[in-house]
Amino acid sequence: MNPLRSIQHNITTPPISGGQPLDAVGPQAQQSHPKRISPSQLSQSAHQALERLSANAEHQRLASLVRNALQDGTFQFQSSNHTQVTYKASICLPADTDTVRTDHLINNELTVQARLNDQSEYDIVSAHLHGSSKAISFDVPSPPPAHGSASSVLSERTHLGMSRVLSQDAVDSSSPLLSSPDHSRPPSQHIGSVRRDSDSLVSDNPVVQALLSFAQADQQFPTQAASIAGVQLEMRPRRDIEKALEEFKGAFTVEKAQLMSGANSSERVDEDVNADIHIPLLLKAIERGAAAFGPNALIGQNSAKAFLASCAPKITSNDDVLSEFINRKLKGDDDLQVRLGAQELLHVATKKEFQLGGLAGSIGVSSILGSAWELGASELLKNAIFGKNFSPSQYALQLAGIDSVPPLMIESMDTMCVLAIIKGMKGEEWSMSDLLPKALKAGAISSVVSFPNNVLQYAGFKSKVGDLAANSMTTEAAIFGAASGIPPEVKESEELMRAGLFQSMKDGVMAHPGEGADTKKTIERMTRHALDIAPGESTAVKSMGLASIVGMIPLIASNKATGLLSEQVLRIFRSTVFNPIEAIALNALALGGRVNVPGLFDSDNAKHARVVQTILARASQHMEAGDRDISAEELHQMLAPRSEFLRHVGSAIVNGMNASFEAIPALVRKLGYGEAPLAERIPYQDLAVPDTSRQPAP
């Protein structure tokens, strides 16, 4: 059956066959054609032909491409003869969204043949889409000359350039948008099929469904929307989100904060903090929209609100009516655009990247030095000092002291690699001079803390249960000592972020928590929520929990417990796995964030998709921006669920270790020596009065 129905005209014209030449209309051969052709230059008959093709499921996509190219002005003049003119456009169908099975149609040429009628308007004769190996085309009969007085029916025909089978293969309207093997889908991209269900539109993708619910919350979709099968809807980044995130971070990095003087709490001194607060700012923007920012939240000459709105995802579809309707709804809702833009940036800001360099360095240092010590140097040194047939129990303390020396070097170098991994995950620059003091301190702690465990390797308790309990405690202590560079790093990030948030509120960058709110508790909660999802700190904390579990394997497999592995094998395990456990755990957790097991644990992408759903659902329920707020705890639960066992274990370990590290300095301060730490010098009480002296003039 002919897919195009006849079009009625007021004159009589014979049907045009496939091989019949088209007669020139007017001075066609001498006509100077424009370099580009636009919709305004088409005849009414051409528009009608495209509309009728758009209503046909088989050719809807090609007609849509022609209309889009006309509107964008991408059709360029190619050639002309005595009968028609040819225009061509390059169509780059997204390689990661195969709207027409683009495994064969990635690089496409779209050509249109047209002829100029007596009204100086162009009638479309045919259109062709040429891919790398296949082509799709349709022919439209030439409309009659404008003069004449009879009427007849034009015989319109359509043919598929290669074969009708191509229509089934290349334009399968029931297939979902496929992912190109050569291009990874952006993490914040959401694609779903759309179909009509009674008077509403529904989708198989939860995020797309939430978007449809918002768009039709107060009015129905046009009847033309999704009127055919195979309609797809896509949310994808509007701009270069990585670059936008760098702009956002740069604008809201707090370089100095006004803190209490160590000598006099009533005095304020400017202190370098270089605090990164972009994650808590983005969280607050998702929670409160534009109300999250104060009057001085600027990125260059633009407000933070306008900047985030420009980062909101764009909506595309192979149904122009559908995409136009939804985009119009989104553009009219500034608050929703701000929240969606903030979520786009947050998704990228919390993305965890695999750090191969740091992992290779850690394994290399630990394996080479550790194996050299465990499998050779240790025995040679001890034999040289105590003789070949010495009794280990007789020299337990001396032997333990010797075994405690290598960690000073090995763990110092390993901590350098671990801290470099954390900095890399955070996207921060680092230098050897910055990390070396921290690494040497961690190496010294590891050397001291490993001593009790080393003693028990040579002299244990008579009771097997007591010996196992003692070994378990000292092994965990040794694990914590080996990872002692992580807790101070997390604490430093926490203190700097608190100071940065305090100063941003004081400077009118971030909105004040509100009258009656406890500003200290608010800032502490914001900091905790941000660090729970920050790529560096959150992974570091979880790695402590993972290391505390995996690090017990050598003890469990030894002859002190199950005896599953020989001492020789355990030595190799300790050198290759136990020593670099923090670096291995950090990268394993980064990769684990990409794994999604429904009902068990969610990937990072799944968590952020749930946030987008919540934002859209709240907008659907409350069309007024002021009623859409998402509570801080609700958002935190979506991004850092309570079910994250390793986070809870790691947090307990990190907090406990930091408390033990702080015990002696706190005692010294009580005796009147030393300066209070940064966290204790933040004057939260100052937020009760706006600091107008530091705010720029309007």
From Swiss-Prot:
Organism phylogeny: Bacteria, Pseudomonadati, Pseudomonadota, Gammaproteobacteria, Pseudomonadales
Stretches with biased composition (Low complexity): 172-181
One of the GO biological process terms: symbiont-mediated perturbation of host programmed cell death
Source superkingdom: Bacteria
Sorted UniProt keywords: Hypersensitive response elicitation, Secreted, Virulence
Family annotation (InterPro entries): Plant_immune_effector
Keyword Nucleotide-binding in record: no
Name of this chain's protein: Effector protein AvrPphDPgy
Role noted for this protein: Effector protein involved in non-host recognition.
One annotated Gene Ontology cellular component of this protein: extracellular region
Subcellular location: Secreted
Polar residues composition bias: residue spans: 1-15
Region entry Disordered, spans: 1-36, 171-200
